[in-house]
Each structure stands twice: as C-alpha cells, then as structure tokens.
Amino acid sequence: MSLILSNNYQALGESFSQQTLPAPVGQPSLLLWNEPLAKALTIPFTKDNDAELLSQYFSGNQLIEGSKPVAQAYSGHQFGHFNPQLGDGRAHLLGDIADTQGQRWDIQLKGSGVSDFSRQGDGRCALGPALREYIMSEAMFALGVPTTRCLAVVTTGENVYRERPYDGAVVTRIAASHIRVGTFQYFAARGDTDSLKKLTNYAINRHFPELIANSSENSSDNSDALKADNVISSQQVLEFFSAVLSKQIPLVLSWLRVGFIHGVMNTDNTTISGETIDYGPCAMMNAYHPETVFSSIDRNSRYAFGKQISIMQWNMTRLAETLLPLVDSDEDDAVEKIEPLLTQFHQDLQQGYLTMMAAKIGIDEPAEGDGKLINDLITLMKEQKLDYTQTFTALTDSLNDNTTEEPLTDVLNEWLPHWNSRIESFKSSAHTLMVSNNPIVIPRNHHVEAFLDSCQETGDLTALNKFLAVLRQPYTEIAETKNYQDAPVDGDKDYHTFCGT
C-alpha cells in the first residue's frame, strides 16, 4: 500500500508559493482520523492499522511520497482593509490527490510551522481550534453545505503559547483547491498580468474544465494552444468569472438556510471553488436576529448573519477588479463587459434567497405574496427572539401531526393561518420539502464549546464521537439526537468566538 501525491499547484512556479518544509513536532499522536473521507480519497490507511504512520505523515514529521510542501501566497481584504501580502503563515500544502471519481483535492497541514508569510507568528495551532474545525466542517458537510473538510487531527506533544499554554495540534484540511479571491488580488496588486493569466488558466483547468472544452469546440484552431499556460481569451475569463459566481450562490444560501455565521468573510477566506473555509470564529444562530455576530474581531458587525449575501457580492466585485486586465486592455470596456455578470449575480442571489426561505416553509415554487409571508415570519422571529432551528423544526413537525407547539402557536397566532392557507393543497409535499431543508440538530455553540473543553482536559473522545454521529445525520432523529437539540439556557449572552487555526 502506498500514498503518492501530485504537485499541480506547486508546478505554477515560485511566484505562487514558497517551498518550505513543515517543522517537526516532538511526540505526534493521531487523535482523529476521518475514515469515510480517507476512503473517498483512496488513502489506503486506517487508524486501527496505521496510526503511527498517519501521525508521522499528518504532523509533517514525515513527507508523503511525491510531496513538495509549499506555503501559498495571497493577499486579501481583511474587514474591508487591503493587505497586499498575507499567505500561509502556518500551513503547508503537501500536494493533491484524486478521489474515486477522478476529482483532485488539495491536502494541506495547518499548524505545521512557519513560512515567509508568518508575520511574527509561531506557525502553530492549539488543539481546541483544530477540534473545532473538525467538528464544524463535518457538521456542515452533513448539512449539505459546500465545505472544506478535515482528514486528521494530530496532537504534537508540545505546548502552544497564546494567553496561556495550550496543547498543540496539526489539522489536515482537504479542499477542492486553496485558490482564493486573495490569490488573484496578490498578483493584481503587483501588476503581474502574466501570473494572473497563469492562475486563471490553472483555475479553469482545475475547477471548470468544461470551459476549455467549449472554447476548443467553438475555436477554428483546435491546436494545443488553449492548453498553454498563458493563452486565455477574454471570453474565457468572463465565462470563468460567471462560473465562480455560480459557485458562491449555493454556498452563502446554505449558510443562511442552516443559521451559520462565518465570522471572517475576508477575501482571503473566499474560495474560487465555493467552499466554506476557515472555521476559526464561526458560530451557529440560536435566537434569530439578522445582526447576530459572535466573532470577537468583528467589532463593527461587518460579517453579521444578515450581511453575508451583501459581503459575498462585495468580495466578488473585488475578484472582478483583478480580472479586468484579462477581459480588455481598455479598463472602461472591461468594466462594461463584466458589470452585467455582477448585476445578474445580485439578482440570482435575491431570487435564490426567496426560493431557499420558501423551501423552509414548504413552498417549492414561490409565488406573488410569498416574500411577504416569509418576511412576516422572520420579523416575528426577530421580535420574539425565537430559536432559528427550533422554529422551523416545529413548523415541520406541525405538518406531520397537525399540531403546533403551544408557545409557538401563541407567538405566531396571526401568521400561522396565512401559512396554513398557502400550503393547504399540498401539505404532504410541503412536509417532505421542509424535512430536507430544516435540520433538527446543528452544532450548537454551547455544545461545541463543552466538547472542546472536555476533550482538551481529559483526552477522552467517547462523548465527542457520539456528538459527531448525531451531527452526521442532521435531518434524521437517532437515539442521541435529543441530547443536542436544546438551545442555551441563557441564550448567547457573552458568547464570543476567536480565530484559532
């Protein structure tokens, strides 16, 4: 049995990344291993049989065959302010691997040591944030949200020093790629059009190869020119941008559907592939309010729950700016060509939001008046501080047994008749639709925090594994589900999240 990595991103050249080895750790020990994900990635090892080898590979102590580790370069707008040089300050891209369907996936270590992008950081990660990323990404995957995932968490046997000493860990992240809006900004800020072309061509081949096929079919020249590093047409760039936009719509709408608050939607945390990335300061909605913020560093509520659609539009506009030189040498003409795509993106997001929220109350095809029905509901939820998940679960259950929980009936007594009248003729199909769009359990903040504390204190994963088993079936009730459905007794008072990984 062997595991061999390819190095497709590394082949782009030294301007895209820094070659650097992970820093060895003292006593690596495999804590969590994502067996289903490993199987999908055709990784031929198991925790039971290969724990020692896996701890060496995924701590960075031993290189996987074929691996040429790099720290990737990128820029980014952080809370609206541009930083021209960010990059992987404590992460190493080991390489990429194909899954059983032939799709390629990046394998990246986080907390694996310093690079030229570390900015005085120590390059390390504490165990708590590593566990948070594992829990949250697995929960989001099960909820049907596009997301990066965690393959492994390895403890290092060393302390990480923050406000106090913590156990250290290295987490392995799997992503369709780690190309960010900030990656494009990195080269645009430097006026490096050749590298922008190279990056765009790579991103098309990696994520949207159908654009190459379409261009080849429509071209009078069917030579290998389209495959060359820097040969890319204006039309291809526009089609690429449109394809990237289409990836962001299900991403941000899925966040809103399940009550997820990312917390740090900087352009360096916005992927071209449309995957959720960076779970450091994320949280889940309890009592509904569109201005909910948990991130301790989001002091101006820039990334509040209800602002996530508008921020995604802002981020995509920043991506559009980087592509202008590839669209047309005349900037005004380039803007004229790319602006309609952003306008359409805005319209698609608005329509998508209506369709998503309508599905949460059992309406498959929104009609005139449904927008008001939805707005009336969420206004009541905000005013009465109703729990986001529990409200939609109760409405779903009411179609199954024709009763609504008394507290909810009291609060929604004026709204419920309008809703019942709207879905009267298709209650059975409405119930089916609601079941698939309204999770009965989410990774609630207080439960996640409790497991992070207990795992760090005791090292016992028994209870955490039960929690993960529930989170992996968020639309189906199993024996343990009821243990994790409760909202926090004191609400979200004084709850804050922090960047960790």
From Swiss-Prot:
Pfam families, per this entry? SelO
The EC designation for this entry is 2.7.7.-, 2.7.7.108
The first-level EC class reads transferase
Q: Which UniProt keywords apply?
A: ATP-binding, Magnesium, Manganese, Metal-binding, Nucleotide-binding, Nucleotidyltransferase, Transferase
Positions of Mg(2+) binding? 269, 278
Q: List the cofactors.
A: Mg(2+); Mn(2+)
Domain of life, per lineage: Bacteria
Under catalytic activity, the entry for this protein gives:
L-seryl-[protein] + ATP = 3-O-(5'-adenylyl)-L-seryl-[protein] + diphosphate; L-threonyl-[protein] + ATP = 3-O-(5'-adenylyl)-L-threonyl-[protein] + diphosphate; L-tyrosyl-[protein] + ATP = O-(5'-adenylyl)-L-tyrosyl-[protein] + diphosphate; L-histidyl-[protein] + UTP = N(tele)-(5'-uridylyl)-L-histidyl-[protein] + diphosphate
Is this entry keyworded ATP-binding?
A: yes
Q: Where is the active site?
A: 268
The UniProt entry's coiled-coil ranges are: none
InterPro entries attached to this UniProt entry: SelO
Q: One GO molecular function term?
A: ATP binding
Q: Where are the transmembrane segments?
A: none
Where is the secretion signal located? none
Q: Does the keyword Transferase apply?
A: yes
Between which residues do disulfide bridges form? none
Q: Which residues are listed for ATP binding in this entry?
A: 87, 89-90, 110, 122-123, 173, 180, 278
Q: Which NCBIfam families match?
A: PRK00029.1 (NF000658)
What family is it from? Belongs to the SELO family.
Quote the function comment for this protein.
Nucleotidyltransferase involved in the post-translational modification of proteins. It can catalyze the addition of adenosine monophosphate (AMP) or uridine monophosphate (UMP) to a protein, resulting in modifications known as AMPylation and UMPylation.
Identification of the protein by name? Protein nucleotidyltransferase YdiU
List the source organism.
Colwellia psychrerythraea (strain 34H / ATCC BAA-681)
The organism that produces this protein has a lineage beginning with: Bacteria, Pseudomonadati, Pseudomonadota, Gammaproteobacteria, Alteromonadales
List the gene name: ydiU
